[in-house]
Amino acid sequence: MGNPKKNSKDFVPNHIGTQSKKAGGNKGKQMQDTTGKQPIVDNG
């Protein structure tokens, strides 16, 4: 937590976890993204 650079390995898995959360909250983001920006990832 204090030394993210030292825990480079921990940083990678951390990112995956963050992405998972983003995917779950994509529903809410999709509505906001509908303003005129629809990412292809959302389509998939």
Curated annotation (Swiss-Prot):
Broad class of where this protein is predominantly found: other
Highest taxon of the lineage: Bacteria
Tagged with keyword Transmembrane helix: no
Inducing stimuli: Expressed only in the forespore compartment of sporulating cells.
Span list, region Disordered: 1-44
GO cellular component: endospore-forming forespore
Cellular location(s): Spore core
Record field: transmembrane: none
GO process terms (BP): asexual sporulation; sporulation resulting in formation of a cellular spore
Keywords of the record: Sporulation
HAMAP family: SspN
Family, similarity comment: Belongs to the SspN family.
Protein name: Small, acid-soluble spore protein N
Source organism (scientific name): Bacillus cytotoxicus (strain DSM 22905 / CIP 110041 / 391-98 / NVH 391-98)
